[in-house]
UniProtKB/Swiss-Prot annotation:
This is Membrane protein insertase YidC. The chain crosses the membrane at residues 7-24, 364-384, 434-454, 473-493, 508-528. Required for the insertion and/or proper folding and/or complex formation of integral membrane proteins into the membrane. Involved in integration of membrane proteins that insert both dependently and independently of the Sec translocase complex, as well as at least some lipoproteins. Aids folding of multispanning membrane proteins. GO terms for molecular function: membrane insertase activity. It is a multi-pass membrane protein. Its main location: membrane. NCBIfam families: PRK01318.1-3 (NF002352), PRK01318.1-4 (NF002353), yidC_nterm (TIGR03593), yidC_oxa1_cterm (TIGR03592).
């Protein structure tokens, strides 16, 4: 039996099953392996309030969208537009909520004049960041704030910061002034909550900071599954992803209290995260508040505030692309929102190396090519052993077929004869298998590196490839991949089974069809890898691994 071919068939079968499983999840069906990781089918997420679950305690659940209350408000809310070098956005004076945020340096990948909108409050999509007070009838995100010192709302000229402040009405003897600080070139927003006790008795409020999002799936490459949902990070339990489906069932498992870390909403390429001050005690919550609406947040108690006194609660809000080096400098563990899945331990060093190569060549496409060359060079000894074994197996294939034909009625004698042939010719049937198996985790890791890296968005390579995160517009790379797979197949030993031989010829067609829909960066990697493999195999089999044929 050809062990290497069997291993390849197992890999092919597992790949097909995993691709089908991704298709299941992308269409809102349960995963065959991880039932809790199902993509919830996209649905309109309006602003109707839901019933607050016990997880978030008394955090108000209303005002999730543009129409938060069925009762006509006493004051009319407005949308205050602002602009910096990295953001265009809107702050809703109802709650002083950050209701819209467009990333001006991240194109939408389809139209050159449009950009990625992260936070939004349209009829079909809700994603926002908001804060408020608990512990009494204090101002929260349902109350209409007033903009203080209205004036310039744009970061212009030589200014490095833009501050926008909003004041709440007095409720429960408390007034809140919320200030957003935007810094040039930064995706980190400073959020300062000043609590003034204008009453006659001490107050002990709790500040809540939360991210609210519907379960509308973001667009990802076909046959590829990336995480969408809340996440929590603490020093004790590190990175904890929370599936929407677990929140649906009230079965989410995550750390509920800490004095460090952050909470986030994660999607493909982009994330947002509340980062409270380190050392400040806080409770952590995540819950479903509407049929299609979820939230994750923290509740941070404030020490008693005497009449006439005030307290400041400072936090940071990250909202932007999942650029690994940038995230590492913002908060511990924040780079983990860039989801490599179970291959993180290998993927992170690979991305580091890819990034270093890009620093020299200045083009992500050529960086992928050079990284693939480097990996093939590192694994050359293993590949040489594999191809030598394949070359020897190919040389003795006619003799193996003759033995199978001679002893086809007696499987035991056939196996004994084959083993004797292997021993005589010093051929290890497992010799071509182990080197391939060892390399598989590295190639899978590189796949996830290229799939998860926002740096590929809008990154050109050459000529017709203008965006490595999008599929090849002319399908040139998938065709080249199919051709390279056919060439590889022709270099391998011919399977003795005619049916198996036909299936091996069909594999390049099946894989090339799938790769027609893969991002160009991924296909580029596989094409280069195949071409290098062909060159290695040809060189080794012709120059190093040749064996003279012997009669059966």
């Amino acid at each position: 039996m050809d062990i290497k071919r069997t291993v390849l068939w197992v890999i092919f079968f597992m790949s097909a099953v995993m691709l089908y499983d991704n298709w299941q999840r992308d269409h809102g069906r349960p995963s065959m392996f991880f039932p809790s990781a199902t993509h919830t089918a996209p649905a309109a997420a309006g602003g109707a309030s839901g019933t607050s679950a016990t997880t978030a305690g008394d955090v108000p659940a209303a005002a999730a969208g543009a129409a938060p209350s069925t009762t006509a408000p006493a004051a009319q809310a407005q949308l205050v537009k602002f602009s910096t070098d990295v953001y265009d956005g809107e702050i809703d004076t109802r709650g002083g909520t950050l209701a819209k945020l467009t990333l001006k340096k991240q194109g939408d990948g389809k139209q050159p004049d449009l950009y990625i909108t992260l936070f939004d409050h349209t009829a079909g999509h809700t994603y926002l960041a908001r804060t408020g007070l608990l512990g009494g009838d204090f101002p929260n995100h349902n109350d209409v704030y007033t903009q203080l010192n209205p004036g310039s709302t744009s970061l212009t000229g030589d200014e490095n910061t833009l501050k926008l402040s909003f004041e709440s009405p007095v409720k429960g003897g408390v007034k809140v002034v919320k200030t957003y600080t935007f810094t040039r070139g930064s995706y980190v927003i400073g959020v300062d909550t000043k609590i003034d006790n204008v009453g006659t008795a001490p107050v002990t409020p709790t500040v809540y900071m939360e991210l609210v999002r519907d379960n509308t799936a973001v667009e990802t490459p076909m046959f590829s599954h990336t995480f969408l949902g809340p996440a929590v990070y603490t020093d004790a339990k590190h990175f904890q992803k929370i599936d929407f489906s677990d929140l649906d069932k009230n079965k989410a498992n995550f750390e509920k209290s800490s004095d460090n870390g952050w909470v986030a909403m994660v999607q493909h390429y982009f994330a947002s995260a509340w980062i409270p001050q380190q050392g400040a005690k806080r409770d952590i919550y995540a819950e479903k508040i509407d049929p299609t609406l979820y939230r994750v947040g923290v509740k941070q108690p404030v020490a008693a505030i005497a009449p006439g006194q005030s307290a400041d609660v400072q936090a940071r809000l990250f909202a932007g692309p999942e650029e690994e080096r940038m995230l590492e400098g913002i908060a511990p563990g924040l780079e983990l929102v860039k989801d490599y899945g179970w291959v993180t331990i290998i993927a992170k060093p690979l991305f580091w190396l890819l990034e270093k190569i890009h620093g020299y060549v200045g083009n992500w496409g050529w960086a992928i090519v050079l990284l693939t060359v480097l990996i093939k060079a590192v694994f050359f000894p293993l590949s040489a052993a594999s191809y030598k074994s394949m070359a020897r197996m190919k040389e003795i294939t006619p003799r193996m077929q003759a033995l199978r034909e001679r002893f086809k009625s007696d499987p035991q004698k056939m196996n004994a004869a084959l083993m004797e042939l292997y021993k005589t010719e010093k051929v290890n049937p497992f010799g071509g298998c182990l080197p391939v198996v060892i390399q598989i985790p590295v190639f899978i890791s590189l796949y996830w590196v290229l799939l998860a890296s926002v740096e590929m968005r809008g990154a050109p390579w050459i000529l017709w490839i203008h965006d490595l995160s999008q599929r090849d517009p002319f399908f040139i790379l998938p065709v080249l991949m199919a051709v390279s797979m056919f060439v590889q197949t022709s270099l391998n030993p011919t399977p003795p089974d005619p049916v198996q031989a036909k299936m091996m010829k069909f594999m390049p067609i099946a894989f090339s069809v799938m790769f027609f829909f893969f991002p160009a960066g991924l296909v580029l990697y596989y094409v280069v890898n195949n071409v290098l493999s062909i060159a290695q195999q040809y060189y080794i089999t012709r120059k190093l691994g040749g064996v003279k044929k012997k009669p059966a």
